[in-house]
Amino acid sequence: MNASCKRIVLGIANVMSWPWRLLPSGLREGILTGLFVLDSRGEPRDGLAQLLRLQDRLDWVTNERAVAMGDGVHPKHRLTRYHDFFVEHIPAGTRVLDIGCGVGAVARSIATRVKGSEVVGVDRDDGRLAEARAADNPENLSFVKTDVCDSLPDGPWQAVVLSNVLEHIEDRVGFLKTILQNAKPERVLIRVPHFERDWKMPMRKELGLNYFSDAEHFIEHRLDELNAELAEAGLRPMVTQTLWGEIWMCCECTESDGQ
């Protein structure tokens, strides 16, 4: 479902929800559960596949409500504390390039919490950059519109942040090599979704269903897959954590890259 369709669905739901919500919550839950059970009957394989497709829709609505509750910021930033990983692995006084910064949440945390840092967030989405620039930003944080496959802000940069970026890139090794050549970082901090986060991921793959958390993903890595790509690109993980269904890494450039 594209963004326009989602907006239409949500608009209709906002209008039609009030009579539905007049029913007691227990009754509403019972009706919905019954519908899920009815829809899953028949051949077990088909029923499981249908439930997993419905789960995708439910996840979309859950995330929409979470962002609304957070006044435009998903509470995962606060609850999973993944910002801390980036902050803790960036030394004071570092020049940081946050590639694919989105609305600037990670870049803002780094700029605010890493003493003496200079942070530039880059993205190619005008809407997200407008939201990032409109926030309460510290003086050591700025945002630039660019496609990093074509150009980067003037470096060198001591640290490059790739938070939920690599999975959106088809030629990830080529992309990383370009970043290392042009930005010349001392370290690269990476966050990607972990394929082995849940039994449902390989089950989805076995059933021929979508097993990505975003329709724009080309991959959701196993740890060995990510390590192989990083090695080919010229990066060596110094720190690796698997938390919250994600892989977090702080990498250094290998000597073979001349970094």
Language-model region placement:
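A short glycine-rich, Lys/Arg-flanked "PGG" loop and its adjoining helix->strand segment in the class I
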Residues: 174-187
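Acceptor-substrate binding/catalytic loop of class I
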Residues: 208-224
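A conserved beta-strand element that flanks and buttresses the S-adenosyl-L-methionine
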Residues: 161
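A SAM-dependent methyltransferase catalytic signature shared across enzymes that methylate proteins
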Residues: 223-240
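Conserved N-terminal segment of class I S-adenosyl-L-methionine
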Residues: 2-155, 176, 205, 216-219, ...
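Conserved class I S-adenosyl-L-methionine
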Residues: 189-211
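Conserved acidic residues
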Residues: 94, 158, 186
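Hydrophobic adenine-recognition pocket in adenosine-nucleotide-binding enzymes
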Residues: 165
